[in-house]
Curated annotation (Swiss-Prot):
InterPro entries recorded: Trm112, Trm112-like
GO MF, one annotated term: protein methyltransferase activity
Name of the molecule in the record: Multifunctional methyltransferase subunit trm112
Record localization: Cytoplasm; Nucleus
Organism: Neurospora crassa (strain ATCC 24698 / 74-OR23-1A / CBS 708.71 / DSM 1257 / FGSC 987)
């Protein structure tokens, strides 16, 4: 599961739908893998407005990556700063969580991640 995907996931427990604490899910005991993918600046420029930057900063820190800037970079920043472009590409596109858990900040439910796939099936008492 790519780090970019984590930015779009929230807790599936019914009681968490109305809580801001259910997003982002927090990676725990994460085993990461890296795929070498050719950098596509236009893809990053197009995806960046859809990313919740505060959540990405949280996830990035929890996974042990360097702290991202307070504000998301503009398309011009990405085009002029090759190091930033490469750093974001590596984090969003190349880094995958292969094993571990995703934990809800509201209810504490843990979603197991195995072979890069998170199990979002809930027991009947949580639906």
């Amino acid at each position: 599961m790519k780090v970019m995907t984590l930015n779009f996931l929230t807790c599936a427990v019914k009681n968490c739908k109305s809580s801001n604490d259910s997003f982002p899910l927090h990676p725990k005991e994460a085993e990461l893998a890296k795929d070498d993918i050719e950098i596509n600046p236009q893809l990053l420029i197009n995806v960046l407005p859809r990313i919740d930057w505060a959540a990405l900063r949280t996830t990035s820190t929890e996974l042990g990556f360097p702290t991202l800037p307070e504000q998301p970079p503009s398309p011009e920043d990405l085009q002029s700063d090759e190091a930033l472009l490469k750093e974001l590409h590596e984090l969003l596109m190349e880094t995958q969580m292969m094993e571990g858990k995703l934990v809800c900040g509201h209810c504490g439910h843990e979603y197991a991640v195995k072979n890069g796939v998170a199990n979002f099936l809930l027991p009947s008492h949580l639906v």
